[in-house]
């Protein structure tokens, strides 16, 4: 079958790469894709927002399945437009994508269906939010309601820090409309893990658990980012805890979505806190994580195209999804100044080719002449593969020694929690 991937980041590079080696897939298109994705997909210069052009292209080229990578097109309703045109889509409807598009929607739904998460309040006014903060005390978590590229969360260790975050968001300075409503949550103690799942509207098949590293600096210091590295499988989510998360979080949420008249199709991403009381939801995302995708997909031992088509057509079964008995680690190389600002146009030197045991996924690069240059933010995701996590990490960091660009920054402690 022919598959089209929407997006151009590291996650989409990983999706296109994995689909291109799936037995059921004969052709991969990427809209718009990135220069490096031409190695595994045909790039198509169409804007997904021009739905008439997009649908014409998909029909003329007899594309069987569309895989939507980023959250913005999903929250904007791209899946609805394509489904209406009779094109199968791996990705949720606009209504279902509210799980990520609105923190308030997600929290209210979890409360209604008794899905374990942190206690919370919802606020539109600064003074009311500050009163809640004063009553609750710190540490406390302040979240912008809408999409903020993974940066709309402040874990405030003091009341002053929480108050400043509320003022920043509700004034509209930080995230515009996305921050016009805030969710304030109790601080949950524990270790975080990401559990993604394939979903076809009813059936939920969990993927291998991974762990992201959100903070920019070693030791989980500095501001939040879109993610500075991941590894899988994550030992913090034992088989027993994974089953518990499936039974108490993922399956109930998918059942709730169906009951609410917005069945969920695609990848459901549960960001979890593993507390003393068991797994609780930190957040839901309506798509593959970035950079979780870069470690989860290399460990898949099944046909990704077949799985995604089954999700899109309501025919998913657990036996379609098998995993390799090995490990993967991804270290993000970010540009100078990230996440506050980010440098662009710096030449990337060294070896960024693909090998059997290391893969380099491009998050933010451009091809200028013969050279790849940085294009801001997270630049590359260097993935190491191995029989165990130590081997995978050694391969990823070993590979980084042969890559360089001006102001390159990365964490040296990805995966450290797995060895505690």
For every predicted segment, state its role.
Residues 246-268, 285-355:
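Active-site "cap" helix and flanking loop/linker of ATP-utilizing ligase/carboxylase catalytic domains
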Residues 4-5, 100-181, 211, 235-251:
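Active-site nucleotide/adenylate-binding loops and adjacent lid/helix of ATP-dependent enzymes
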